[in-house]
Structures are given as C-alpha cells and as structure tokens.
C-alpha cells in the first residue's frame, strides 16, 4: 500500500464546505468517488504531454478552525503535485460572484471528459438513474486503480478507451444507455481526439 502526503491550503472564509459535500454526496460515482460527512475522496489518473501516467487518490477535507483545506494524496502523485492539487480543488473552490450568501461555491469538476459524459448520460433522467448508468460504464470500462480504499478502485474511461470500442452503441447499450446518448459521447470523444474540441479547464 502506498504512502500519502498532506498539503494545507489556506482559504478566505466563509466557506460552505458542508453544502458542497452534500451536493457531491448525491452525485458520487461508484468506484471513483467517496463522500462522507467530512471529506471528498476520489481516484486520480494524471497524464503529462510525454505520456507519463500517475495514478492514486486525493482526499479533501475542511479545517474550518484553521480556515484551510487539507488535501491528502497518494505519494505516486507527488511528481504531479501541483496539477493534482489544482484538479482536486476545482470541484470545490469556484467562488460565486454577486450573490447574497457568503461562502457559496459553484461546484466544478475534476475530470472534464468524465463530467461531460455524465452530463450527456444524465439528460432527461434522474440523478440517481444517471449515477447508476455511469457507474456501470466505469465498472466495465474504467481503468483499475489501486488506492487502498475499498470501493475506490477505478477511473473514468479515457477518450482513447472510448474510441477503441468496436461499437459504442452496443457496448454502452448493454449497460442501459440509449443509442442517441452513446452516439453523442462517441462524437464528443472523436472531436476531442482530433483536436476539434478542448475541454481542459481554462480552455
């Protein structure tokens, strides 16, 4: 089992962390995310431009007394620590401008392709139904990741993995996804792979 490193990140209060956790708890993706009363934990797979891959997990919890977020990550992620921290905080640290409730953050996302696929899957169905479908996809096609935590063991399929499917309609259809949604995900993956669509944060 790998070790971990911990980083403390100061924020300007107030920070409504419990509300964010409640949002993510209702949408936690099986095998990828775990949310309890005090923390958000998920699998991580980072790949640099040279094709080097780092896999592990990231856990974020709030130290409200110290006005800081406590980020704990697998030591395999140390070479990409700045990217890991940035992406770990992305779902948790987008401040809302011009609102009347101090400390509110707009939930972001960790993996843009993952969240885009989940948005397609979730069209016109309930959050619960969308989570079940997404969970089946990641269980069948997601890369296995060792985290040392039961139930936290896969990453969302990469663009290349989706494109390698002989028939996405058949592959995802077996799991309950309708053809139009499968085709939409396939078209999105193709556009990303061919450089026509950039979902990177800040693009």
Residue spans of the language-model regions?
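HhH-family (HhH-GPD) DNA N-glycosylase catalytic core used in base-excision repair
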Residues: 1-203
């Amino acid at each position: 089992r790998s070790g971990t490193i911990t980083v403390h990140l100061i924020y300007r209060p107030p920070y409504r962390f419990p509300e964010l956790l409640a949002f993510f708890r209702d949408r936690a993706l099986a095998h990828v995310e775990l949310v309890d009363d005090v923390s958000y934990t998920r699998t991580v797979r980072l790949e640099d431009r040279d094709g080097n891959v780092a896999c592990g997990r990231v856990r974020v919890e709030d130290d409200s007394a110290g006005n800081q977020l406590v980020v704990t990550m697998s030591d395999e992620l140390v070479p990409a620590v700045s990217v890991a921290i940035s992406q770990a905080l992305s779902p948790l640290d987008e401040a809302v401008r011009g609102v009347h409730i101090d400390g509110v953050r707009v939930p972001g996302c960790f993996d843009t392709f993952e969240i885009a696929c989940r948005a397609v899957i979730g069209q016109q169905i309930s959050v619960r139904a969308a989570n079940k479908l997404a969970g089946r996809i990641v269980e069948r096609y997601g890369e296995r990741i060792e985290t040392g935590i039961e139930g936290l063991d896969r990453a969302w399929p990469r663009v290349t993995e989706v494109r390698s499917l002989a028939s996405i309609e058949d592959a995802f259809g077996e799991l309950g996804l309708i053809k139009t949604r499968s085709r939409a995900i396939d078209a999105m993956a193709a556009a990303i792979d061919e450089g026509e669509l950039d979902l990177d944060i800040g693009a």
